[in-house]
């Protein structure tokens, strides 16, 4: 039963009726037996019966009368087994006919209880009926009893005696519930509930809305309420609940078999009791046990104690197979293990080019096996190859020489994918061309380590081989490492020289005064290199070189070209790796990128040695400047030239750092003679502070602050003394100054003092570590040092887990956001200006407008000239002009105002940060946004800081907790009150008794009072004007409150600014658009306030797009439209409220999502990525976008060239003989067919 998943448009789920379950089934399972312990064959009518589920061996019936494929489809007359493939045992279902109906625990136990809502009964009453504790009146007849009234056993008997046995009808158990459900008139109930809603309020209204929701769901889905009670239980295929023999003759079996066995045993016993006309109480007890057995099968542990197996371990039921990280969704559908993959330790490969990786031969043989076999067969025996698959296999197993030759051929230009877990962003998987290496470790290019966050201390990486031609083409065109130069989060280069490469280039471009060969003048770069080889000059020597000797394309002015340029030997060598028409880089300044300064050019005949004596030295090129050069090259010359430059920079860096012979020794850590003096002063000051405290002049908090401040000042003093005494040739200084490794504080700890340490609770210990590592620490100092360090380690571990979970939730909520069209045609934009925090600029305007489209023309206020037209992309040049013109606010196209459904349009998104080009239709921008926000999560702090000073012990939540608070739309800590009216602050009263203060605001129509804690810092004073939605006191706003009193756009803008504050404070840059995508996803739902004449329900939560559609339909037919208000959902809630039940079920609360979806008969439109991955369909992003899928079909259907001659029978026969061997390689098998 092969289904082509790429053919269907959507997937629907619903309640299965008993008839449907019987239709699925291939037979009834009547016995609890599994397999016979002697013959090891499946028992007849048992849980593994071959007659029901199909043969255990391929094309062979149970008794062995029919064997081989030629009997396919025949049902054996002896054993009744159909001769077919054993794969059917993965798809054929059976069923159990129950002797008494049982309820489905999902619909009775879920919150809210679906049965309870339909029947208008409490879950407790339902439980009493279902588990045979009480009777329920089904038909009161002419007695004073009421329908659905609960009566106890004793009352039932009493009423029977009182009114007679046939006057009323009361039952217990699931059959009673089934009868009640079957009697429900949904249409009538819906009508009554709608009338009730007109005047109901409070709790009553809430319950009515809930009930109406469920009733409408049943009406629209066509599900019948009585289907929530089962007469038949489906039995899943046996290969999904296998039983395998272990060594030693014991069997391991799936828990489900035990659970099914309990159901069958109890069901059979109940049948027997009913046949025997057993007493009611015994039958009741058996029915209750059957109900409990089915409950345990569906969801063990949901009610009462879970059924446990050996060793008191709870058995895994059907629900558990779907739930959680080990469930079907997350373990087998969203993440599968694949063939043609491997993993190994990685090692550095400095000899590789940017797009290469070193693949160990041993791994390559294993990974490329099908291609090797195919090539060996193509070669044929006459060329040392093979004739068929078997002999090809032998050649490979015997490690024949020909295999290595073929391997070289096969691997050539066949890209492979490398992945390092955790894959935090799209650069966690990149494509490389394999280069065969010896050994067992894969070799990785040193420059891609940043993107992978890899190092060579034992990290492992996974490798995958793309098999099809399309997959190889995509890997080559879209995923080659050489084209991944920019980070998707901020568009800055992520590939930059580090460590040895940085220090090499730093050393190369260092200048020294008065060394060998200073002032020599050369006619060309070659001459300079020759002089260096002959030891006439050194790398750092300042020299002159004829500007005319450089390439014509070098952007020198004519005046400069006729003169002598002063530079150093190293800089001449460095500039050789830059493109010919790129300015000569002589000093580490960004102005140099537009051309070299005239001061570096001297007229021929000038006394160059004398000129050098008066000229100060230029700084060497540090890590940051090297990154700037890469960014410039990328902007001007695109990918290919940049990757060439990177490789050259890497080779040059390694070469020079090796030649420089930089080492670190104890003698490089200089001692500071003045240190003792500084410490003495500090000790005296601390003694003075302690004295004042003892006299009662200071509080303990003040004393603590002053003491820690004293030691902090002492450390700063030592630090500045150290920096002053530094020798610029000191290797440790060079390492930190160049940005290769370490920073100044490391040096201070080596040569100065370690300073103050933090305790595990984050508080600073007031006893400082006065020693440094050169002197060595005392026992107490050592203890103080390690005390806080331990906290650092545990924090990091916790942070990683928290950050990973945040990323998972972000990805889930945004995975359906894909660039779906060119232009959505919106008429709204977003006014952006620099994000400020007080007077501090958090994110400048330049960063916010770069790579976005202008919504309105941007006009220079001074000249009136148009800098950017409407819908024009703002690139670096335009952005510079806007900033230079002094413009403070620009209206841009924003994702917040984009009207594209399930995604965004190109114009509202703008530039793709990872490529620097305009985003393409099909780009999965939601996932990229989620990863961009989640990836730096581990760099954020975990702590809640105390602000300085004693008076303000107000906690500020920062770092990861603050980001979570914003995205989960939680009530923020220490939040500010928001004014709900525009008016004047008339009074501020303090009430010391209850430690509050009351702020009164008088608006035009009403007066509001706000009670705040006494410690709150107010933003307003008496007599101030205040606008609606402004904060009354300091602190973060609650976005859920803000959205009630201001516009959606204002709320979105506030959340964007808050997220940016957290990341930018920690020095992490993230493009606005990523945050915009997330915030928009949190605000895509509205709640219906008044449904008007639409089919919507009051209080219903639905997508803005669906709401607009419903209204448009109503307005067109001249009826009253519905009204709604926007709802802000946290990312977890938003993920679960998605239109795709597959995506929601695979995220969290699997059973709840599926219960709800089944009742509503939900249809999953398969618009997001996750739901398509789950069903194995090509995802609707990238080359899987519908538009591109059709193009592919046209290409395939290109006219076929006529065959030159029709093949003879012999030729065909030969082709078929070869076929099994070549079926692994595409070309050969296609031609054979």
Swiss-Prot record:
Reaction(s) this enzyme catalyzes, per UniProt: RNA(n) + a ribonucleoside 5'-triphosphate = RNA(n+1) + diphosphate
Region of interest (Disordered), residue spans: 1211-1233
Binding site for Zn(2+) 2: 824, 898, 905, 908
Residues bound to Mg(2+): 455, 457, 459
GO BP terms in the entry: DNA-templated transcription
Top-level taxon in the UniProt lineage: Bacteria
EC number per UniProt: 2.7.7.6
Cofactor note: Binds 1 Mg(2+) ion per subunit.
Entry's Gene Ontology cellular component terms: DNA-directed RNA polymerase complex
Cofactor: Mg(2+); Zn(2+)
Composition skew (Polar residues), residue ranges: 1221-1233
Pfam families: RNA_pol_Rpb1_1, RNA_pol_Rpb1_2, RNA_pol_Rpb1_3, RNA_pol_Rpb1_4, RNA_pol_Rpb1_5
Compositional bias annotation for Basic and acidic residues: 1211-1220
Residues annotated as binding Zn(2+) 1: 61, 63, 76, 79
GO molecular function term, any single one: DNA binding
Keywords linked to the UniProt accession: DNA-directed RNA polymerase, Magnesium, Metal-binding, Nucleotidyltransferase, Transcription, Transferase, Zinc
Complex and partners: The RNAP catalytic core consists of 2 alpha, 1 beta, 1 beta' and 1 omega subunit. When a sigma factor is associated with the core the holoenzyme is formed, which can initiate transcription.
UniProt function note: DNA-dependent RNA polymerase catalyzes the transcription of DNA into RNA using the four ribonucleoside triphosphates as substrates.
Homology family: Belongs to the RNA polymerase beta' chain family.
NCBIfam families found in the cross-reference section: rpoC_TIGR (TIGR02386)
The protein's name: DNA-directed RNA polymerase subunit beta'
Organism whose genome encodes this protein: Oenococcus oeni (strain ATCC BAA-331 / PSU-1)
UniProt lineage: Bacteria, Bacillati, Bacillota, Bacilli, Lactobacillales
Name of encoding gene: rpoC
């Amino acid at each position: 039963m092969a289904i082509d998943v790429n053919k269907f448009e959507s997937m629907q789920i619903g309640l299965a009726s008993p008839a449907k379950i019987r239709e699925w089934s291939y037979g009834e399972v009547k016995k609890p037996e599994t397999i016979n312990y002697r013959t090891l064959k499946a028992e007849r009518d048992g849980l593994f019966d071959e007659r029901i589920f199909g043969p255990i061996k391929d094309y062979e019936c149970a008794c062995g009368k029919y064997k081989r494929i030629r009997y396919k489809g025949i049902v054996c007359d002896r054993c009744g087994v159909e001769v077919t493939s054993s794969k059917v045992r993965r798809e054929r279902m059976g069923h159990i006919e129950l002797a008494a109906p049982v309820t489905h625990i999902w619909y009775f136990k879920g919150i809210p209880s679906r049965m309870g809502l339909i029947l208008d009964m409490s879950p407790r009453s339902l439980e009493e009926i279902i588990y045979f504790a009480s009777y329920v009146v089904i038909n009161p007849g002419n007695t004073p009893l009421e329908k659905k009234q609960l009566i106890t056993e004793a009352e039932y008997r009493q009423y029977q005696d009182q009114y007679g046995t046939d006057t009323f009808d009361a039952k217990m158990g699931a059959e009673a519930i089934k009868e009640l459900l079957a009697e429900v008139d949904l249409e009538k109930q819906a009508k009554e509930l709608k009338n009730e809603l007109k005047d109901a309020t409070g709790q009553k209204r809430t319950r009515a809305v809930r009930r109406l929701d469920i009733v409408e769901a049943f009406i629209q889905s066509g599900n019948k309420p009585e289907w929530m009670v089962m007469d038949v239980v489906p039995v899943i295929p046996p290969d999904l609940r296998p039983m395998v023999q272990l060594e030693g003759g014991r069997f391991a079996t799936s828990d489900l078999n035990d659970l099914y066995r309990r159901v069958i045993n109890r069901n059979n016993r109940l049948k027997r009791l009913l046949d025997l006309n057993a007493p009611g109480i015994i039958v009741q007890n058996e029915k209750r046990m059957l109900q409990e057995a089915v409950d345990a099968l569906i969801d063990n542990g949901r009610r009462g104690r879970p059924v446990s197996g050996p060793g008191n371990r709870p058995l895994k039921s059907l629900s558990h197979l779907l739930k959680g990280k080990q469930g079907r969704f997350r373990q087998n559908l969203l993440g599968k293990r694949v063939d043609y993959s491997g993993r190994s330790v990685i090692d550095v490969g400095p000899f590789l080019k940017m797009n290469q990786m070193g693949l160990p031969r041993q791994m390559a043989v294993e990974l490329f096996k099908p291609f090797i076999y195919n090539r060996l067969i193509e070669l044929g025996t006459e060329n040392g190859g093979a004739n068929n698959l078997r002999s090809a296999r032998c050649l490979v197993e015997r490690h024949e020489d020909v295999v290595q030759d073929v391997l070289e051929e096969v691997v050539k230009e066949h890209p492979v994918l490398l992945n390092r877990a955790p894959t935090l962003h799209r650069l966690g998987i990149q494509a490389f061309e394999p280069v065969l290496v010896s050994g067992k470790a894969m070799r990785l290019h040193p420059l891609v380590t940043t993107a992978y966050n890899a190092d060579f201390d034992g990290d492992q990486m996974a490798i995958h081989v793309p098999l099809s031609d399309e997959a190889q083409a995509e890997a080559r065109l879209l995923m080659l490492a050489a084209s991944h130069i920019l980070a998707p989060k901020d568009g800055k280069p992520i590939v930059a020289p580090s460590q040895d490469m940085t220090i090499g280039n730093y050393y190369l471009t260092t200048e020294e005064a008065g060394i060998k060969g200073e002032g020599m003048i050369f006619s060309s770069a070659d001459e300079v290199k020759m002089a260096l080889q002959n030891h006439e000059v050194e790398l750092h020597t300042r020299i002159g070189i004829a500007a005319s000797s450089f390439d014509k394309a070098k952007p020198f002015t004519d005046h400069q070209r006729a003169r002598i340029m002063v530079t150093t030997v190293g800089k001449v060598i460095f500039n050789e790796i830059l493109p010919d028409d790129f300015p000569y880089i002589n000093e580490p300044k960004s102005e140099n990128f537009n051309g070299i300064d005239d001061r570096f050019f001297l007229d021929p005949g000038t006394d160059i040695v004398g000129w050098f004596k008066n000229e100060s030295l230029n700084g060497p090129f540090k890590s940051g400047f090297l990154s700037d050069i890469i960014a410039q090259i990328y902007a001007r010359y695109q990918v290919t030239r940049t990757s060439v430059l990177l490789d050259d920079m890497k080779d040059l860096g390694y070469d020079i750092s090796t030649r420089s012979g930089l080492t670190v020794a104890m003698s490089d850590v200089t001692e500071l003679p003045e240190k003792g003096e500084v410490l003495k002063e500090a000790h005296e000051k601390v003694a003075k502070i302690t004295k004042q405290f003892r006299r009662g002049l200071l509080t303990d908090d003040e004393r603590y602050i002053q003491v820690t401040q004293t030691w902090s000042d002492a450390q700063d003093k030592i630090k500045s003394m150290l920096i002053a005494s530094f020798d610029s040739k000191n290797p440790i200084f060079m390492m930190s100054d160049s940005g290769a490794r370490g920073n100044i504080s490391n040096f201070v700890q080596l040569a100065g003092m370690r300073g103050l340490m933090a305790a595990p609770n984050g508080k600073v210990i007031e006893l400082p570590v006065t020693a440094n590592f050169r002197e060595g620490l005392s026992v107490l100092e050592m203890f103080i040092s390690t005390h806080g360090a331990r906290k650092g380690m545990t924090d990091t571990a916790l942070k990683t887990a928290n950050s990973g979970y945040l990323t998972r939730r972000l990805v889930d909520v945004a995975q359906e956001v894909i660039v779906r069209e060119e232009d959505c045609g919106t008429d709204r934009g977003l006014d952006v200006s620099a994000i400020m925090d007080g007077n501090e600029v958090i994110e400048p305007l330049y960063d916010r407008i770069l790579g976005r489209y202008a919504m309105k023309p941007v006009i220079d206020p001074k000249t009136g000239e148009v800098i950017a037209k409407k819908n024009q992309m703002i690139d670096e040049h335009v952005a510079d002009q806007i900033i230079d013109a002094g413009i403070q606010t620009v209206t841009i196209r924003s994702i917040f105002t984009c009207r594209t459904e399930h995604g965004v349009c190109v114009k509202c998104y703008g530039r793709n940060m990872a490529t620097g080009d305009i985003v393409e239709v099909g780009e999965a921008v939601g996932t990229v946004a989620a990863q961009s926000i989640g990836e730096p999560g581990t760099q954020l702090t975990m702590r809640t800081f105390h602000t300085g000073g004693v008076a303000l012990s107000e906690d500020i939540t920062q770092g990861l907790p603050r980001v979570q608070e914003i995205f989960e739309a939680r009530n923020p800590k220490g939040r500010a009150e928001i004014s709900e009216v525009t008016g004047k602050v008339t009074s501020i009263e303090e009430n010391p008794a209850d430690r509050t203060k009351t702020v009164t605001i008088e608006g035009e129509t009403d007066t509001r009072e706000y009670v705040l804690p006494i410690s709150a810092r107010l933003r307003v004073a008496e007599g101030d004007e205040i606008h609606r939605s402004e904060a009354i006191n300091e602190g973060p706003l609650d976005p859920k409150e803000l959205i009630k009193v201001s516009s959606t756009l204002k709320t979105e803008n506030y959340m964007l600014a808050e997220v940016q504050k957290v990341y930018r404070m920690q020095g992490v840059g993230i493009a606005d658009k990523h945050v915009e995508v997330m915030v928009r996803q949190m605000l895509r739902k509205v709640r219906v306030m008044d449904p008007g004449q639409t089919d919507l329900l009051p209080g219903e939560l639905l997508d803005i797009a669906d709401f607009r559609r419903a209204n448009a339909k109503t307005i067109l037919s001249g009826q009253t439209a519905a009204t709604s208000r926007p709802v802000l959902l946290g990312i977890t809630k938003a993920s679960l409220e998605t239109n795709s039940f597959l995506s929601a079920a695979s995220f969290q609360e699997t059973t709840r999502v599926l219960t709800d979806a089944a009742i509503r008969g939900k249809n999953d439109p398969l618009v997001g990525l996750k739901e398509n991955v789950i069903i194995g369909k090509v995802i609707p992003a990238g080359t899987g976008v519908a538009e591109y899928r059709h193009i592919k079909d046209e290409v395939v259907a290109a006219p076929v060239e006529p065959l030159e001659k029709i093949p003879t029978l012999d030729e065909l026969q030969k082709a078929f003989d070869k076929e099994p061997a070549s079926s692994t390689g595409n070309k050969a098998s296609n031609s054979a067919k």
